[in-house]
Amino acid sequence: MNGKTEETGPFFMHTRTAWGGRTARFLSACALALFLLIMAGLACSALGMTAKASIAMNYLNLSLDLVRDHVVPNLLLTAALLLVLAWLVCLTARFRWLWIALCAAWTVAAIGFVLGGGFTQRGDSCMIIWAAECFASGDYLPMQSEYFQGYSYQLGICFFLELIKRLFPSANLMLLMQCLNALLSAGIIAALTGVAVMLHRREGTEAASMLLFLAFVPFFLYTTYVYGTTPMLLLCACAMLCFTGYTHTRQKRLGLAYAVFLGLAMVLKPNALVPAIALFICAILYMLETGDRRLAAFALLSCVLCAALPAAVNRMYELRSGVPLGNDIALLPRLTMGLQDGETAAGWYNAYTEQFIGSQVTVEAEKAQAMRDLMTRLEEMRCDPGMTLAFFREKCLSQWIEPGYEIVWHGSICSKEGRFNGLANLVFREGETIRMLLDAYLNIFQQALYILILLGGVDTMRRREFRAEHAMIPVILIGGFLYHMLFEAKAQYSYPYVVMMLPLAARGLTMIGAGIRRIRKK
């Protein structure tokens, strides 16, 4: 070929795809290797340590302590839990109707839990609910608050809640959204189970995926949290399902749906940008692998929608209220805060960005101040490598090995005003027997889950499945892990990535189940 090929005709398509396929597989393999490295570190760390979340002295804040755990008992209990889960999958894999019924019962139980507990909200959730109720009644006073002037991206979830309030004007918006969270969570189970089945196609995958969701208690408890997390997760899960479906069928409607779902997810929560970028990368890998440019075009459309839809919502509220929005806090101050010591742990929120909220702060002044503080912090890190290593170690572990992902702490600080609030208090109140048992289970389950995710990745590597759709989950995790190692850390920020990795954990569980079946046949 003398290094030259024509850019038209089947021969060009073949040679370009052959070269592109090798490149795509190599990049996917590299992503999978890095993913395995991260998950191996998290799994080992979770076995030897845990991040204990408790109520701080001022009652509202989170106190987080990294404590050493007992490795041998943890290993034994984790192994026992893995065997029980795998045995259940082997026993019930053929009974699809049973798992559908169990998921329906789980949804009903979640609705009963939020109604019976009557969980109130704290912090950002209160502000968002209040603003949505005001907007639904034509009152735009919240637009004048410093909160929305500095965090205008929260208007996306406000818009969603406002629509719900307008549809059900006489309903309690908080309780209604909690019940809706239960229904949306059932949708997440369905979407990510579909992803697991399409990616792995192994007997028992569907049962394994549903079982892990039902056994993952934080997923159940997050129905009490009125925020953009659960709705965003559903839209991201649907985007992953459509993306995977397109790679199997090349149906254009799936590609379009993938782009739209991600755009809507970005409206609800800006954290959706990480899955959006990850799927964009995977779409490029798919184009290199197959020569199909359409998925890359849909990925580009998703990026446009991720930028345009939140801006459109903000502009709509500006026009409706007549109140112009200020500039959101930029990424540079957020990066600076993420590299500082936080109130809870290294890199967690410390109110550094609050100084930049207000009309008196110009963009230039914000950038200059944040850059000076960032340079000062980087110089401190350069001069003390030991401190730097300890900082990033604490930042990583504090957000990834907190077994409840902050939702148990959130439940403990919320008032319970429902008919069965006594039972809810028994579950969440520190020192209660049920709470101690819950903490112990969450700790063991997190260890088991990380091991299953690691096993799923190892099986993918072993089978040399380096296609773009198999790189999807590893790239999402890598993106989320690296982003929150630099920017603000929170255990609740890690939670969506853990949920999105459950299809890979299902693969790990079916591996163990297959091993059990082979032993039984002997």
For the regions a language model picked out, list residue spans one by one:
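Transmembrane-helix motifs of polytopic, lipid-linked glycan transferases
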Residues: C179-H200, C238, L452-G456
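Loop-to-helix entry region of an early transmembrane alpha helix in multi-pass inner-membrane enzymes
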Residues: Y151, L155, F159, L167-G187, ...
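Transmembrane-helix signature of polytopic, membrane-embedded enzymes
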Residues: W97-W99, L192-A215, R467-A471
